[in-house]
């Protein structure tokens, strides 16, 4: 099963479908008049995963991330980039994911980013 993302005129993902065969981008685009790009359900941060671990064959990694509604397709990177979660976060161009300006605390607690305080706050 392959997955395909429909792009709008601004390269925003507006729809994602599953289809039975590979390499249907051109066929979907021609038949619907919309632009479609294949996306890999098992790709995240430029790494392809099988059963939750990086796959031995990384040639299956496709467009950095599985496309979701609201993601952007970046033609120059050939990548799906998720929406920016906070204004202060920075795009890691190597993996096409947004990173916080401060690393997540590693003390085992559950934290959430507080944009106003520009810090991680313990979730209670």
Where are these regions (language model features)?
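Interaction-interface detector
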Residues: 1-124
């Amino acid at each position: 099963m392959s997955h395909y993302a429909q792009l709008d005129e601004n390269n925003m993902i507006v729809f994602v479908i599953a289809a039975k065969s590979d390499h249907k981008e051109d066929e979907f685009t021609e038949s619907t008049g919309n632009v479609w790009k294949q996306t890999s359900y098992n790709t995240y941060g430029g790494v392809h995963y099988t059963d939750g671990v990086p796959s031995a064959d990384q040639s299956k990694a496709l467009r950095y991330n599985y496309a979701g509604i609201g993601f952007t397709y970046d033609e120059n990177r050939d990548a799906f980039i998720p929406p920016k979660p906070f204004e202060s976060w920075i795009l890691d161009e190597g993996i096409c994911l947004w990173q916080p300006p401060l690393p997540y605390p590693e003390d085992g607690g559950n934290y959430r980013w507080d944009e106003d305080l520009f810090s991680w706050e313990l979730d209670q």
